[in-house]
């Protein structure tokens, strides 16, 4: 996905989020603000973490009013401390009030993912293993959540189903066997650079190697099974460990020497980073 396409998609999703929240009008703001009055408000971080999503935060207000100005004191990827001032937002107070929740939802969610990803990625430092996300993302938030993973030091697996072949258990069941599924994928999508197959036992590992899989995902296998699987694979395919990956066991898994470790928790279980807009006043 190129930069222009990503921007158009992001704008569309942000606009939909604003429609969802504001609907026909912000009745509370309109009841206390009868006309345009300029104001400013401080963007403050209330937890230590890694910031991500500042441009998305900014875009929320720009789509409501292009005259809104934001001065940031941090950039995406920066480590932030509790109580730190991240920036100042200036503009029509009605816009600041109506856009506040949507803007913060994006920033808190994305910063939470970046923070959690960073804490896991640090455990892989100094190894060859790359930390990957999955497609287990919040509906209509994937473009933002996968960006946040990258900010936190992780890597993106497939963005969508068009990005590559990943043969999972149900695909294999539909095809009839690992071998048949891999051959069908090769016949249908020869332009795809790599074909990945998910395996659950050593027999499937052997079959995937013999069928010529490019990447073999060891899914929910025990540590000892994975050690044996790597001996079977013996460099004939890249390797990925997935399933029940936690911060508590990831260092042990890294010790196996797999090429990739994928974790859905990076996006589906990361807590938000507490960030707020405080001190709104007329200028």
Show where each model-derived region lies:
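Acidic/glycine-rich phosphate/pyrophosphate-binding loops and surrounding catalytic core
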Residues: 2-211, 215, 228-232, 238-241, ...
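Structured adenosyl-cofactor binding patch, chiefly the S-adenosyl-L-methionine
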Residues: 271-280
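Short acidic, glycine/proline-enriched helix-loop-strand junctions
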Residues: 235-238, 280-283
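Short secondary-structure boundary segments
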Residues: 220, 243, 264-265
């Amino acid at each position: 996905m190129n930069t222009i396409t990503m921007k158009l998609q992001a704008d569309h999703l942000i606009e939909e989020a604003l429609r969802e929240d504001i609907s026909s009008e912000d009745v509370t703001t309109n009841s206390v603000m009868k006309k345009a009055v300029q104001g400013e408000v401080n963007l403050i971080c209330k937890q230590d973490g890694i910031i991500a999503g500042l441009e998305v935060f900014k875009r929320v207000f720009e789509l409501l009013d292009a005259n809104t100005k934001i001065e940031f004191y941090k950039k995406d990827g920066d480590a932030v401390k509790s109580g730190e001032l991240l920036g100042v937002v200036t503009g029509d107070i009605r816009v600041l009030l109506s856009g506040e929740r949507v803007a913060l939802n994006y920033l808190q969610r994305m910063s939470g993912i970046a923070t959690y990803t960073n804490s896991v990625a640090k455990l892989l430092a100094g190894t060859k293993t790359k930390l990957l996300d999955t497609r287990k993302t919040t509906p209509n938030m994937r473009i933002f959540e996968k960006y946040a993973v990258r900010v936190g030091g992780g890597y993106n697996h497939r963005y969508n189903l068009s990005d590559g072949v990943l043969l999972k258990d149900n695909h294999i069941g539909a095809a009839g066997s690992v071998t048949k599924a891999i051959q069908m994928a090769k016949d249908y999508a020869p332009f795809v650079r790599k074909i990945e197959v998910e395996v659950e036992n050593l027999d499937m590992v052997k079959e995937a190697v013999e069928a010529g899989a490019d990447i073999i995902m060891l899914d929910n296998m025990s540590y000892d099974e994975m050690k044996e699987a790597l001996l079977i694979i013996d460099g004939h395919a890249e390797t990925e460990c997935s399933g029940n990956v936690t911060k508590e066991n990831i260092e042990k898994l890294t010790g196996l020497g797999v090429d990739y470790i994928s974790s859905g928790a990076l996006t589906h279980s990361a807590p938000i980073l507490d960030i707020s807009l405080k001190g709104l006043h007329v200028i």
